[in-house]
Structure formats: C-alpha cells, structure tokens
C-alpha cells in the first residue's frame, strides 16, 4: 500500500510548515535530554580532572625546579585547586539532584512526548489523509470492552483514539497489554498483545454477545493463550468448517444470531486471515470490536534517538492508511454477509 501523488504532496507540504518543524524539534529535545545530561556529567568530570591534574603538574614541576616559583605560578595553582573543588561540589550536587528529580522528570517527559507527537505530528498527518478525522487524547476506548477482545493482562496501555467521524463511528487505538513478572534479575514485562484495536457501531442484526478468538495447536493440544473464553450466560460453539474450528474458538450468548452471522462468506474471510493476522472479534448489541495482534505500534512516537532518526513521515502516513484499510476490509466483510446486514 502506498500514497497517491496528491497525498504525498499534502504531507510534504505539512512537513515543511513552521509548526511541524517546531514540534519535531521539541520531540528531538525530549528524546535527547538524557544524552545531554550525560554529556554534562562527562564535561564536569573532564574539567574536574583537568583542574586537579593541572594543579598537581604545576606543583610537581615547581618542586623539581623545572618551573621557577613565582606569584603567577602560585596564583595559577590556587585557581586550579579552587576550580577543582568547585567542579567536585557541582558534580556531587548534580548527581544528587538528578537522582532526586530524574525519575519523575523522565515520566513527565514521556507523557509530554506522547501528547506532543499525537497532537502536533500524528493528527496533522491523519487530517491530511482524512480531513474529517481527529485524535482524542483525553479518553480511551472503554477498557472493559477492550478486555473482551484481547488477552487477559495486568496492564493495558492505549494510544489516543483515532476517529474518522464517519457513519460507522470508527475508532482505533494502539494497544499494549502486558504482565509484570519477577525473575532472577528483577522484574520484567511479559507482552500479551501488541497491535491495534478497532471499534465500530453495531448496525447489523447481530444479537447478544459474540467472541471469536484465535487458537494455536501443538500436537493434539489446543491453546488460545490468555484470550477470554465463555462469557456469562454464553457457550462455546463449533461450525461445519474444519479449518475455522482449528484456528478459532467461538463463544456466544445467542447461538441463533451467531450462526446466522457465521455464513460461509464470513468463515472464509476469517480463514483467510490466519496467515496474515492474529485476529480476534467481539460484539455486543451496541458496538463491534476487533483486534489485530501484529506486534507493531502504528501510532506511537519514536522512543529513542535511533528511532527518531529512522522516522519517516511517508511511512507513518502509510501505516495510518493501512490501519483504516484493514478496518474497511472488516466492515466490507460484514456488509457482504448476504442476508445478515
């Protein structure tokens, strides 16, 4: 998937605007602040070392008679000693101050980075492609609903909500779901889901709750990981398609409505996804949710200097287009489901 010539023109014009350049510079400053702090400490240590080595060398040279003792040499040695003491005190103070405020400052910088990137970089790119779209940075897709379509985890981190403001009320977010576990070397994150979650209005005749989750097989054992199973008042059902039963588990509260939904067209579409996506699906009577676990964050800001240097506005625009292309593919599948919509 690529960009049209018109889209390329729009985003290149956007990239050259003063506001975009100013925001990008601010992002670069956020990502390089720790490097600048490290350079500051290295510079202080170098100056401290220079002062003490310089003072010691002058003292040794005068004691050996290589340099004549004079008021100038004495004053210079005294200056170097005082500067050394100053830089030593400054270094100790800086280390204590950094240890005191550094962690909190870093957390604030991360929050600032996300907000700045979504509002001043991602949103303008999105609006260049889809003029009526916006990013809601104040809310999440309802966490209780997100938990119905992704693996059970301790923590769920969402991006801002990308909204097309169309008749489907399409919303999408990056989602990172993970647990924190303790190992021999301390605590570490265990990723359960990394990808995108989509939500649209349920304008179809799908009743009750329906959940379709991917499965994996090893020898004779089936495993659906941490994906949720049967909901309250629900049950697990199978379909006649063997391939579908091998790759997905289906749970519902209204079997009649679910079987009406699971036409050969829908089943074939889900089967076609197995080689491309790890797709899960959940619906209630108001909204439909589907999640694409692809181990990618489409909407995340660069997290370090290397990713900042590798960032390209064209690639970001293509990822945005792909996300909505995938959402359109799911929606079209639902509409093509003859006799259902």
What do the predicted segments below correspond to?
Residues 1-41:
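Cytosolic juxtamembrane N-terminal segments of multi-pass membrane proteins
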Residues 30-44, 87, 105, 109:
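Amphipathic coiled-coil alpha-helices
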Residues 38-64, 89, 93:
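Canonical alpha-helical transmembrane segments of integral membrane proteins
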Residues 65, 92-121:
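Transmembrane-cytosolic junction motif
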Residues 65-91:
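Hydrophobic alpha-helical transmembrane segments
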Residues 123, 127-131, 135-178, 187-341:
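Charged, low-complexity intrinsically disordered regions
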Residues 182-184:
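Flexible, membrane-facing loop/turn or short amphipathic-helix motifs
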């Amino acid at each position: 998937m690529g960009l049209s010539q018109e889209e390329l023109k729009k985003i290149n014009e956007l990239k050259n605007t003063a506001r975009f350049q100013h925001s990008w510079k601010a992002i670069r400053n956020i990502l390089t602040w720790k490097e600048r702090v490290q350079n500051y400490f290295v510079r202080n240590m170098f100056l401290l070392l220079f002062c003490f080595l310089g003072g010691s060398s002058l003292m040794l040279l005068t004691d050996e008679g290589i340099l004549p003792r004079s008021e100038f040499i004495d004053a210079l040695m005294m200056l170097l000693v005082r500067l050394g003491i100053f830089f030593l005190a400054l270094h100790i103070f800086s280390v204590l101050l950094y240890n005191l405020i550094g962690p909190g400052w870093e957390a604030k910088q991360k929050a600032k980075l996300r907000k700045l990137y979504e509002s001043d970089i991602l949103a303008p790119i999105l609006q260049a492609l889809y003029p009526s779209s916006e990013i809601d940075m104040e809310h999440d897709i309802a966490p209780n609903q997100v938990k119905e379509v992704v693996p059970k985890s301790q923590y769920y981190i969402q991006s801002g909500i990308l909204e097309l403001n169309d008749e489907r009320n399409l919303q999408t977010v990056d989602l990172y779901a993970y647990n924190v576990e303790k190992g021999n070397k301390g605590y570490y994150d265990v990723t359960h889901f990394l990808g995108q979650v989509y939500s649209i209005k349920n304008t179809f005749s799908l009743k009750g709750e329906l959940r379709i989750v991917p499965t994996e097989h090893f020898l004779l054992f089936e495993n659906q990981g941490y994906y949720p199973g049967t909901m309250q008042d629900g049950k697990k059902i199978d379909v006649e398609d063997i391939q579908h039963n091998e790759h997905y588990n289906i749970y519902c509260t209204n079997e009649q409505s679910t079987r009406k939904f699971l036409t050969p067209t829908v089943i074939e579409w889900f089967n076609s996804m197995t080689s491309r996506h790890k797709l899960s699906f959940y619906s209630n009577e108001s909204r439909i949710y589907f999640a694409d676990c692809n181990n990618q964050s489409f909407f995340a800001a660069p997290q370090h200097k290397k990713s900042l240097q590798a960032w390209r506005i064209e690639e970001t625009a293509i990822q945005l287009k792909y996300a909505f292309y995938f959402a359109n593919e799911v929606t079209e599948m639902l509409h093509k489901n003859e006799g259902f919509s």
